[in-house]
Swiss-Prot record:
Span of the signal peptide: none
GO CC annotation, single: L-type voltage-gated calcium channel complex
Gene name, Swiss-Prot/TrEMBL: Cacng6
Tissue and organ distribution: Detected in heart atrium and ventricle, aorta and skeletal muscle. Detected in heart left ventricle.
Presence of keyword Cytoplasm: no
Protein name: Voltage-dependent calcium channel gamma-6 subunit
Similarity section: Belongs to the PMP-22/EMP/MP20 family. CACNG subfamily.
Length: 260
């Protein structure tokens, strides 16, 4: 009877020690509330950038192409396009602001004809106001933008895994993904600018002559610029969180500490 009590006590001690060890390991693997709050704040910044990026890539108000108003005509034409489709609108000149020489802005009510670009399917160029797109440049801008969205999604997944599973080694990968997505968005914007210039120069030798055009970048492109900046900021924030804390403590000593 005495030996059985001894073995039972030893078994209880062993189980208690194992439970304490496992609890200590889980505590070491977990995130402190302060660090978890910083990561959540960085994720919130990244989500704002991701929302702007999806809004920019999914809409077709990257650039507006406006014809000049003509005397004796009650309507004029304007177009707005993005990465995937183009919309040509017929606007009433009476709705156009009086001090404006060109037709537009494209947000005015009017008859719209929207079509998706065919160079994603059949490889055909689009014709806008007797001008031809350069499909290679447009395709490059769209593909780079999609790669940026993919990197952004991977970054969000990495940060979510850090918060849910405590896998802090994924934080650096998430920082790289967010920074890469911001850079890819900026590259896509620059390539799209080149595609607009190529479109304006691609006049078809047809009759009647191609109308004069004026162009202006619209709010979708502004969302893309904002998304790129915010995603880069999010990547930098996550990268700073992966750095060791002791260099910053040495640069910012606590008040009231011992002095030499």
């Amino acid at each position: 009877m005495m030996w059985s009590n001894f073995f039972m006590q030893e078994e209880d001690r062993r189980r208690t020690a194992v439970g304490r060890r496992r609890a200590q390991e889980q505590q070491n693997l977990g995130l402190t509330p302060e660090r978890e709050g910083k990561i959540k704040l960085g994720l919130l910044v990244a989500i704002v950038g991701a929302t702007l990026a999806v809004l920019a890539v999914g809409t077709e108000f990257w650039v507006e192409l406006n014809t000049y108003k003509t005397n004796g005509s009650a309507v004029c034409e304007a177009a707005h396009l993005g990465l995937w489709k183009v919309c040509i609108k017929r606007l009433w000149q009476a709705d156009v602001p009086a001090g404006r020489e060109t037709c537009g802005p494209a947000e005015l009510p009017g008859e719209a004809n929207c079509t998706y670009f065919k160079f994603f399917t059949t490889g055909e160029n689009a014709h806008i106001f007797q001008r031809t797109t350069k499909k290679e440049v447009n395709l490059a801008a769209a593909v780079i933008a999609v790669l940026g969205l993919t990197a952004m999604a991977l970054g969000c997944l990495c940060v979510i895994m850090v918060l849910s599973k405590g896998a802090e080694f994924l934080l650096r990968l998430g920082a790289v993904c967010f920074g890469l997505s911001g850079l890819l968005l900026f590259v896509s914007l620059e390539v799209f600018r080149h595609s607009v210039r190529a479109l304006l120069q691609g006049v078809n030798p047809e009759t009647p002559p191609a109308p004069r055009l004026a162009y202006e970048y619209s709010w979708s492109l502004g969302c893309g610029v904002g998304a790129g900046l915010i995603l880069l900021l999010g990547g930098v924030c996550f990268l700073l969180l992966t750095l060791p804390s002791w260099p910053w403590r040495s640069l910012c000593p606590k008040r009231g500490g011992p002095t030499a």
